[in-house]
């Protein structure tokens, strides 16, 4: 009984996906080798993993020569105004630039994974020390940047505090000025009221001042002969003294 048809789709489990990739990659490299040996074919195989790691196989001594042959067959002969030698030099230069960029890309990918704590197994002790120094330098730079940011924020807050203190001082001076003016107005009003009250008392004292009574130096006591019930009034004549008491 044969195997059933396997549905081709992405393996969701990360571990299973890595295992499947390793098995299929090894099988693919083996098939390429067998094809080159059995059929005397020129085979070049390039595989990049999902993490950017390169796997390659070439049946000849140089991958670059196989790629040059591929470009010649795929893109055709160069233009008429360009000689074959110049075209070859241009292709070689392009291939070298491509290889440099590829190596740079792979190096950056490895560095990124190492900084994230991945793929540390192949690293030597010296590489790990170098990575540790890089991380320490990065941490120092991050802390320095954070400290400078906090100092800038502190400076801004201090400037705002100074402006608020100046505004508060100006408001306090204005309030003190208002209080002094209000106190002066109250004192002026009290002085005016006291002056009117004192003037009224003085005028009342003048109204109710006791006038001196003029009196004669002599006093007569008795009755007139004509009117026994009437009191004898005082007069200037000495002959009238006590006239009512005489027979």
Curated annotation (Swiss-Prot):
In which domain of life is the source organism classified? Eukaryota
Tissue-specific expression = Expressed abundantly in the seed coat and to lesser extent in young buds, carpels, petals, and stamen.
Q: What residues does the MADS-box domain cover?
A: 1-61
| Chief site of localization | nucleus
Query: What does the record give as the organism's lineage?
Result: Eukaryota, Viridiplantae, Streptophyta, Embryophyta, Tracheophyta
Biological role stated in the UniProt entry: Probable transcription factor.
Pfam hit, one: K-box
Q: Name one GO molecular function term.
A: protein dimerization activity
Places the protein is found: Nucleus
A cellular component term (GO) from this record? nucleus
For this entry, the protein name equals MADS-box transcription factor 1
Gene name for this UniProt entry: MTF1
Please state every residue range assigned to the domain named K-box: 91-181
| A biological process term (GO) from this entry | tissue development
Keyword line: DNA-binding, Nucleus, Transcription, Transcription regulation
Instruction: Show the InterPro entries listed in the entry.
Output: MADS-box/MEF2_TF, MEF2-like_N, TF_Kbox, TF_MADSbox, TF_MADSbox_sf
**Organism, as annotated:** Pisum sativum
């Amino acid at each position: 009984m044969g195997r059933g048809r396997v549905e081709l789709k992405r393996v969701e489990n990360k571990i299973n996906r890595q295992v499947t990739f390793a098995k299929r990659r090894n099988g693919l490299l083996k098939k390429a080798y067998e094809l080159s040996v059995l059929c005397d074919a020129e085979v070049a195989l390039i595989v990049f993993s999902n993490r950017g790691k390169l796997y390659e196989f070439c049946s000849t001594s140089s991958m670059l020569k196989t790629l040059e042959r591929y470009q010649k067959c795929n893109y055709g002969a160069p233009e008429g105004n360009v000689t074959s030698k110049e075209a070859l030099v241009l292709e070689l230069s392009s291939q070298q630039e491509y290889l440099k960029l590829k190596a740079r890309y792979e190096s950056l990918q490895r560095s990124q994974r190492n900084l994230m704590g991945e793929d540390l197994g192949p690293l030597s002790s010296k590489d790990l020390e170098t990575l540790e120094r890089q991380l320490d330098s990065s941490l120092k730079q991050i802390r320095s940047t954070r400290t400078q940011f906090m100092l800038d924020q502190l400076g801004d807050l201090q400037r705002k505090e100074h402006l608020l203190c100046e505004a508060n001082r100006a408001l306090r001076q204005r309030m003190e000025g208002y209080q002094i003016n209000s106190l002066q107005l109250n004192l002026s009003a009290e002085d005016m009221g006291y002056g009117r009250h004192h003037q009224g008392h003085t005028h009342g004292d003048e109204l109710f001042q006791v006038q001196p009574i003029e009196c004669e130096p002599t006093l007569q006591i008795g009755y007139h002969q004509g009117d026994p019930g009437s009191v004898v009034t005082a007069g200037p004549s000495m002959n009238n003294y006590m006239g009512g008491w005489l027979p």
